[in-house]
UniProtKB/Swiss-Prot annotation:
Subcellular location: Secreted
Record's protein name: Synergistic-like venom protein
A GO MF label: toxin activity
Primary localisation category: secreted
Species of origin: Dendroaspis angusticeps
């Protein structure tokens, strides 16, 4: 009986998401990039390109709760795995 109870506890711990925190690449293309753990409720990484001129884009990355909209002359990539927005 104790073995069954212990097995159930172990299976429960393995199957539950106990405080998993998403890690995203953050920063701008000009200021350098790093990684950070996202705050509670932020379960999406994003990478946003904004066209600044011919062949010139400003790129920003980070964590978000909802995928941001692309600007008229840009695009956005959203994803949900660690460092998927490189």
């Amino acid at each position: 009986m104790k073995t069954l109870l212990l097995t159930l506890v172990v299976v429960t711990i393995v199957c539950l998401d106990l405080g998993y925190t998403l890690t995203c690449v953050t920063g701008k293309s000009i200021g350098g990039i790093s990684t950070e753990e996202c705050a509670a409720g932020q379960k999406i990484c994003f990478k946003k390109w904004t066209k600044m001129g011919p062949k010139l884009y400003d790129v920003s990355r980070g964590c978000t709760a909802t995928c941001p909209k692309a600007d008229e002359y840009g695009c956005v990539k959203c994803c949900k795995t660690d460092r998927c927005n490189k």
